[in-house]
Amino acid sequence: MAEFPASLLILNGKSTDNLPLREAIMLLREEGMTIHVRITWEKGDAARFVEEARKLGVATVIAGGGDGTINEVSTALIQCEGDDIPALGILPLGTANDFATSVGIPEALDKALKLAIAGNAIAIDMAQVNKQTCFINMATGGFGTRITTETPEKLKAALGGVSYIIHGLMRMDTLQPDRCEIRGENFHWQGDALVIGIGNGRQAGGGQQLCPNALINDGLLQLRIFTGDEIIPTLVSTLKSDEDNPNIIEGASSWFDIQAPHEITFNLDGEPLSGQNFHIEILPAALRCRLPPDCPLLR
């Protein structure tokens, strides 16, 4: 068997009792692969483990968890300086796994682990909000953000991505649109937004394709706004094709500025960020990620 450089797996603490994962790691170790494992307990652990990974000289840091774990690890990687920065590997173990699903990471743990270690490392973009917080997949605002933020953990654990839809249906009568103004390159819109999606990736909220044209290595962010005054009529209208849908506004830009007269909340790969002013910009070729050769999000 070919020799591969060492890897370090940063595993979300919720997945420590995953027996199939333990077995998959043991099998690869028996085949001669060096895989270090570190468990996250609190915010900031991922950044510390990335520092350790660099000292160990590993070629890949694998994010084992959901979109939030991938976000933490990728953010820590793009903050590294110097040469020989490890590539990002992805092991989908979260509730929705939106980014992993959209880029074509296998669901089978053994296949995903092998891809994370031996896959081709490709330069991909990330996005940054207000020069501080980053996201690798998507920033969502409005209805979708409130649903993903408020969905109970027990419901997510039991039903996965479907839980977001169920909780959303339960809350429809209480949700109102957000008034805001959005600017970008050759783009300007203002009005009432029920859902805002700004994507480096394509899907969020357990498989909802909010930005179906997004690519992760084109230097652009994709914007999609669902407009309207009432939730149910707007959701019904989304069943139409995009060309016939007056409730969908789309744009593409390397940056977007968002202003609101009141505080609104964006969900950045699962982490909420509230405010009235947001500057979101793309960071081209910010890190290398091990992806399948047929990844649909590459140009």
From Swiss-Prot:
SUPFAM superfamilies: NAD kinase/diacylglycerol kinase-like. Its EC number is 2.7.1.-. Binds 1 Mg(2+) ion per subunit. Ca(2+) may be able to substitute. It is an enzyme of class 2 (transferase). GO terms for biological process: phospholipid biosynthetic process. One of its GO terms (cellular component) is cytoplasm. It comes from the Bacteria. The keyword Membrane does not apply. It is found in: Cytoplasm. Gene3D superfamilies: 2.60.200.40, Probable inorganic polyphosphate/atp-NAD kinase, domain 1. Keywords: ATP-binding, Cytoplasm, Kinase, Lipid biosynthesis, Lipid metabolism, Magnesium, Metal-binding, Nucleotide-binding, Phospholipid biosynthesis, Phospholipid metabolism, Transferase. The active site is at E271 (proton acceptor). The keyword Kinase applies. GO terms for molecular function: ATP binding; lipid kinase activity; magnesium ion binding. Belongs to the diacylglycerol/lipid kinase family. YegS lipid kinase subfamily. Probably phosphorylates lipids; the in vivo substrate is unknown. PANTHER family: LIPID KINASE YEGS, SPHINGOSINE KINASE. This is Probable lipid kinase YegS. It comes from Escherichia coli O6:K15:H31 (strain 536 / UPEC).
